[in-house]
Amino acid sequence: MNNLDEIKIESKTCLNDQEQEVKIDNMHMSDQDKNKIEIKNKSGLGEKWPEPIVRVQSLAESNLTSLPDRYIKPPSQRPQTTIIDHQPEVADINIPIIDLDSLFSGNEDDKKRISEACREWGFFQVINHGVKPELMDAARETWKSFFNLPVEAKEVYSNSPRTYEGYGSRLGVEKGAILDWNDYYYLHFLPLALKDFNKWPSLPSNIREMNDEYGKELVKLGGRLMTILSSNLGLRAEQLQEAFGGEDVGACLRVNYYPKCPQPELALGLSPHSDPGGMTILLPDDQVVGLQVRHGDTWITVNPLRHAFIVNIGDQIQILSNSKYKSVEHRVIVNSEKERVSLAFFYNPKSDIPIQPMQQLVTSTMPPLYPPMTFDQYRLFIRTQGPRGKSHVESHISPR
């Protein structure tokens, strides 16, 4: 049996597991679990996408000279008409850079800098973060190798809108939607009940072992960052983590592959959005820029430092902080010369606990801005509609 045959067998097992998950015995479910299923059923998420999936990488490798209509953004959303970071006063601006060694040594300037970054930018880069550079390089290169496998080796891991887990090419289930120019792979690390090696690729041969080590290191880094964010809000160091569910947090990875694009001025690799989760730790492609962060009315192209992570605040931390920390809109541009690979690690709250502004951050002059909502309920928005700027978190602001 060759490696491809092994993958096909594993894939069938995965599909059977997914089918079995749907056949839930209501008699053995708690009210909380029944509520989860009801939420999912109301969303309309099923096992199939609304249209046949076309792999963006396959389109790019077919020597297209023009972009298919499904990927052409409306004029007002095209990067050519909205990018203004080439202006001299903007070109040298970058997101703040935080030295974690210095920060954890008690440097007050760094504490102030990361607090300002969370409040004003929603983004920062971290250096001296404790993750080995060799592991970062191996993670990026191994996933590049995965996307360079024959298409049939990847298709056995095709995902569905129900969980998004696996190999995918679209976000949202709206029929006829204008799509982004990317493929991706999505998988779970935490909770352990969702961590299933059979749903991880088996090729290249080292990918599962490498990915597991990478995930464990990023969970540690996420926990360390949470203590700093919590302290800078005037809370106990552990308090933000406790609001996430303590040790029962969620952690998942989306590996983004952005192929060369024949008309990059008409498309986006990822549409503007803020991340629905708690915190994102991004390993960017440090050879090819692509991430842009909205700062006021300006799109700033992030210049990634080698062996640095890009960290951004998600909607859940904005909610918990009662909007003291900001989840900021960002997008990805593509180019015609080079493909890009980035690894977005999502550090999220436990999916079934209510997330709401921390009581210590609510005052008579700053009442709670958001009603309680579980992360399971919240993230259905992006799973059904795809990236939509800041519209989701803003739609949940409580009326005064």
From Swiss-Prot:
Q: Which GO terms describe its molecular function?
A: dioxygenase activity; iron ion binding; jasmonic acid hydrolase
Main EC class of this protein?
Answer: oxidoreductase
Q: Which InterPro entries match?
A: DIOX_N, IPNS-like_FE2OG_OXY, IPNS-like_sf, Oxoglu/Fe-dep_dioxygenase_dom, Plant_2OG-oxidoreductases
User: Can the keyword Oxidoreductase be found in this entry's annotation?
Assistant: yes
Origin superkingdom: Eukaryota
Q: What is its EC number?
A: 1.14.11.-
Quote the record's cofactor note: Binds 1 Fe(2+) ion per subunit.
**Keyword Zinc listed:** no
Q: Which reaction does it catalyse?
A: jasmonate + 2-oxoglutarate + O2 = (1R,2R)-12-hydroxyjasmonate + succinate + CO2
| Gene Ontology biological-process annotations | defense response; negative regulation of defense response to insect; regulation of defense response to fungus; regulation of jasmonic acid mediated signaling pathway
Q: Which cofactor does it need?
A: L-ascorbate; Fe(2+)
Ordered alphabetically, the record's keywords are:
Dioxygenase, Iron, Jasmonic acid signaling pathway, Metal-binding, Oxidoreductase, Plant defense
| Name the record gives this protein | Jasmonate-induced oxygenase 1
Q: Which organism is it from?
A: Arabidopsis thaliana
